[in-house]
Amino acid sequence: MSEATYQRKGRTLVGIVVSDKNDKTIVVRVETLVKHPLLKKYVRRRKKFTAHDPMNECGIGDKVKIIEFRPLSRNKRWHLESILEKAV
């Protein structure tokens, strides 16, 4: 299990893997806190990103870091950078 590191410019996001059913592809749910303009309270926003997992090493529930990458398919524009925490 060798870790490939990609030092590229672009955004990095941290999220939880919610699906790993496709080959070499994971779906990562990223949560952000955004201040509501009218209510002035923080609201949790969730968004799903499809990322490339070249060695199929992620499982559901893993906390991962993904990095912006060139388009690999219609929806895949992110690449797995590292696994921060494995699920139990």
UniProtKB/Swiss-Prot annotation:
InterPro entries xref list: NA-bd_OB-fold, Ribosomal_uS17, Ribosomal_uS17_bact/chlr, Ribosomal_uS17_CS
Pfam families cross-referenced by the UniProt entry: Ribosomal_S17 (PF00366)
Keyword field: Ribonucleoprotein, Ribosomal protein, RNA-binding, rRNA-binding
Single biological process term from Gene Ontology: translation
Record keyword Transmembrane present: no
Alphabetized GO MF terms: rRNA binding; structural constituent of ribosome
Keyword Ribosomal protein: yes
Highest taxon above the source species: Bacteria
Gene Ontology annotations for the cellular component aspect, listed alphabetically: cytosolic small ribosomal subunit
Subunit-level organization: Part of the 30S ribosomal subunit.
Stated family: Belongs to the universal ribosomal protein uS17 family.
HAMAP family: Ribosomal_uS17_B
Function: One of the primary rRNA binding proteins, it binds specifically to the 5'-end of 16S ribosomal RNA.
Protein name listed in UniProt: Small ribosomal subunit protein uS17
Organism: Nitratidesulfovibrio vulgaris (strain ATCC 29579 / DSM 644 / CCUG 34227 / NCIMB 8303 / VKM B-1760 / Hildenborough) (Desulfovibrio vulgaris)
